[in-house]
Amino acid sequence: MKKSIFSKKLLFSFGSLVALAAIPLITISCGQTNTDQSQQPGSGSGSGSGTSNGSGSTPTPEQGNNQGGSTPTPEQGNNQGGSTPTPEQGNNQGGSTPTPEQGNNQGGSTPTPEQGNNQGGSTPTPEQGNNQGGSTPTPEQGNNQGGSTPTPEQGNNQGGSTPTPEQGNSQVSK
């Protein structure tokens, strides 16, 4: 009889000790959770204007996305390279700085104004078409896609030969 009363008291006191020890642990864990939540300033906040700034630079108003390390000037397009393009240009994806009113500059050369796209390593003259090869065609020609330099007033030269003036398309090497 005495053993059962003693065992009941022992179980009760052990249970109360466990409960008392669990209360501070629960309080500490809740306090840490609240502390972690309170130590997050600025979460969910953002500055106005709606433009994305993907680097450490601060773009000026009315710009597009700035993904490089440079600060573009206003009213430009996307600046994805390390250079600073001038206003009113298109996309500058290379390491060169194109002049105003040009198209896209995707190569390492600097085309002159009022040209088309320059995708090669050469600098075409004004009022030409697209220059996709390594040669420099003369003005008022068509597209030059080969390695030869056609004479003026010709059509497209897609082969390795140089046709004479007033011919049509030369597609085979003669």
UniProtKB/Swiss-Prot annotation:
Disulfide links within the chain: none
NCBIfam families the record matches: Mplas_variab_LP (NF033817)
UniProtKB keywords: Cell membrane, Lipoprotein, Membrane, Palmitate, Repeat, Signal
Positions with biased composition (Polar residues): 62-174
Gene: vlpF
Chief site of localization: membrane
Compartment(s): Cell membrane
Highest taxon in the source lineage: Bacteria
Signal peptide: 1-29
PROSITE patterns tied to this protein: PROKAR_LIPOPROTEIN (PS51257)
Function as written in the Swiss-Prot or TrEMBL entry: Responsible for the antigenic diversity for host adaptation. Expression in E.coli of a construct containing vlpD, vlpE, and vlpF yields antigenically distinguishable products corresponding to each gene.
Lipid attachment points (S-diacylglycerol cysteine): C30
Lipid-linked residues (N-palmitoyl cysteine): C30
Membrane disposition: Lipid-anchor
Miscellaneous information on this protein: The numbers of repeats can vary and is one of the basis of the antigenic diversity.
Region Disordered, annotated ranges: 32-174
Organism: Mesomycoplasma hyorhinis
Sequence repeat locations: 55-67, 68-80, 81-93, 94-106, 107-119, 120-132, 133-145, 146-158, 159-171
One Gene Ontology term, aspect cellular component: plasma membrane
Protein name: Variant surface antigen F
